[in-house]
């Protein structure tokens, strides 16, 4: 058995959504590094469900891999932001795994709480390199340390942030999200900014 951290934006698909649907394909990953991690997964692997693009970000719950090597259908959908025109049914480029809901942690484990925990000093999500990948490996010790933190009420000064993040796990009410639209924090790199042209100096005559 192996352990993983998988990121998702809670306003698109959070732990509350996974609790509702029970099982969901983890579509929309468009990083070859993250894809390689998913290809290394096995049925039964445990997952830390990370909420990204919220204040504060952190671990909201637990999931488990129930199916591997699933073709990511969003790559074929021209209306999807994850459409890949190079992908074909005969030669798909992107695959994913299906995960099932396991639990919502009693207490949200923010990144600040994780940074303050010595047992998590080497955890990839807390490092500069590789921290932005939406799928990352974690050690068994790191997984168990995070689960333990999720059972303990945050110290004074932290509960407000934890409660705010917990509220963020529930998506804003409105039109239901269509299945297959994605929830993963995207790894797409922004194009480099063009240098600003220097203003020309007027020549003295």
What annotation goes with each model-predicted range?
Residues 1-43, 153, 161-167, 171-183, ...:
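Compositionally biased, charged N-terminal/linker segments
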Residues 6, 62-66, 139:
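GIY-YIG nuclease signature motif recognition
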Residues 48-49, 64:
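Hydrophobic beta-strand signal
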Residues 205:
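RNA-binding accessory domains that recognize and position tRNA/RNA substrates
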């Amino acid at each position: 058995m192996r352990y993983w951290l998988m990121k998702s934006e809670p306003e698109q698909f959070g732990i509350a959504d996974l609790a509702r649907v029970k099982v969901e394909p983890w579509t929309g990953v468009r990083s070859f590094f993250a894809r390689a991690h998913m290809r290394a997964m096995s049925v039964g692997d445990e997952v830390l469900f990370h909420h990204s693009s919220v204040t504060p970000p952190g671990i909201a719950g637990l999931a488990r891999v129930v199916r591997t090597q699933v073709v990511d259908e969003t790559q074929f959908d021209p209306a999807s932001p994850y459409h890949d025109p190079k992908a074909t049914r005969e030669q798909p480029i992107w695959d994913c795994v299906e995960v099932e809901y396991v639990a919502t942690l009693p207490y949200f484990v923010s990144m600040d709480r994780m940074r303050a925990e010595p047992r998590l000093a080497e955890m990839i999500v807390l490092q500069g390199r590789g921290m932005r990948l939406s799928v990352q490996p974690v050690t068994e010790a790191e997984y168990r340390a995070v689960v333990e933190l999720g059972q303990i009420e945050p110290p004074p000064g932290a509960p407000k942030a934890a409660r705010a993040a917990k509220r963020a796990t529930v998506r804003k009410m409105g039109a239901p999200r269509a299945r297959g639209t994605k929830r993963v924090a995207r790894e797409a790199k922004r194009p480099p900014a063009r240098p600003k042209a220097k203003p020309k100096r007027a020549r003295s005559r």
